Amino acid sequence: MMKVFLKKVNPDQLLSIRSKVLRNNSDFKFCRYDGDNANSSIHIGAFNSKEIIGGVSLIKNDSTHIVLKNCYQLRGMCVNDEYQKKGIGKKIINYAEICCKELQISNLWMNARIKALKFYLKLNYIDSEIKYDIKGIGLHHFLYKKI
């Protein structure tokens, strides 16, 4: 079993993994999110012994489709292709939820890509059945979870 460790990082540390996994190696300027640099934002990186292999950002944002009180948006969840299906994504999400609980955040929500839908449903996220296309990226579902 590969050793993976998780830690809070600054948003710039996630740009390379976001670019590679989520944006087809796009320029980093296309890999930044509104709220990345807010003091309330939380960024988590997953590392093997030498490099970042995954990550996620938690950004204080009102829910876009359903009224959720005291919520954060889960953004930029990614794991390098060669490390997928090894439980790393689940570890990242579990750690993200713990970070939210420590801050007494009640709900997490996200715009989930179709190919990631089963992953989130296994982690007890609720599919609102609201679907929409994000230009240049594809069809997404609005998911949420009370934590």
Question: Residue ranges of each PLM-predicted region?
Answer:
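Conserved acetyl-CoA-binding loop-helix of GNAT-fold acetyltransferases
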Residues: 79, 85-98
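Conserved GNAT acetyl-CoA-binding A-motif
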Residues: 93, 100-113
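Conserved acetyl-CoA binding element of GNAT-fold acetyltransferases
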Residues: 68-81, 141
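Conserved beta-strand in the GNAT
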Residues: 45, 51-62, 73-78
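Short hydrophobic/aromatic beta-strand element in the GNAT-like acyltransferase core
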Residues: 29-30, 41-45, 55, 76, ...
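A short beta-loop-alpha structural element at the N-terminal edge
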Residues: 2-15
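Conserved acetyl-CoA-binding loop of GNAT-fold acetyltransferases
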Residues: 121-130
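C-terminal "cap" of GNAT-fold acetyltransferases
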Residues: 113-114, 133-147
